[in-house]
Amino acid sequence: MGRAMIEVMYEAPDDRLAELVSSFYRLDFIGDRFAELERADRAQFRFQLEGSGEYHFADGHVSPTYPVTIIGPTSAPMTAKADCALSVFGWGMHSAGWAALMGDEGAAYIDRAFDARQIFGDWIMRVRNELIAAAEFADQIEIGCLAAENIFRFKASAPFKFTSKVDAWLAGDSDPDVDVLAGVTGLSQRQLERMTKRHYGMPPKKLARKYRALRAAQLLAHGDSLDDTGLGLAFYDQSHLIREVKQFTGLTPGQLRAGESELTRATMDGRRALGSKVSRLISES
């Protein structure tokens, strides 16, 4: 039996979708057993083009991979499992995109996945059929762009102003201070907590910890120094760094350096390669 192989391709959205979609991607797996960690992440919209499996969330909940699956923001790593070859096309969603898709219902799907047919019915299956027929990633992106333009049902009421301030706060400091965010937004601590829980899946302090850990994980996986970016001062000591990175990626710094999760490494490589075409929150985490 040959060695199992994972390939992940990424592409940035065009200007029409840049405020809603973080990146497009396709994952292809050749093998008969897939069990890979996915770190805590933003919401996802995924088309299962080949194969099927399960998502195992950190709290023990298990969800099947539907033909088209919507996954809410995750606050901790989950494990994707399958016993067959896979091909998955999808896109990540900025927090404004998640709000534009789900409206006030988004908070119910933090660390959860559900069948996109619940919202979009047979239409989304026709999109899936087009993606399967297209085969080439570039052609699938064109189809995906057209589909994505039609899924954001609540775009008019999406909190673009608020999420842009939160994203800038997260990207602008290696250890973001919640008081700074309160000052920028003009919101009370209670209002901030309610808004970030609704749109990001967690309160602001934990959100800052999540992206601090993911940025550190990206550097560690590539053998870079945390001290060169200021992240070295963002953790109390080595044990604090290990705990935080493992909480949000499922892996220790040593495991990241060793490339023990092939999917995690492929994801980090793909996002980093997008560079300036996407937000630093994407390319640096």
Give the residues covered by each predicted segment:
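Long, low-complexity intrinsically disordered regions
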Residues: 179, 193-198, 202-208
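Alpha-helical bundle regulatory/interaction domains
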Residues: 1-165, 169-179, 184-189, 202-203, ...
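Contiguous, well-ordered alpha-helical segments that form the cores/surfaces of helical PPI scaffolds
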Residues: 194, 214-218
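Pre-recognition alpha-helix immediately N-terminal to the DNA-recognition helix
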Residues: 164-165, 208, 212-215
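A secondary-structure capping/hinge motif
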Residues: 196-202, 244-255
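Residue-level "edge-of-site" marker
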Residues: 195, 210, 243, 259
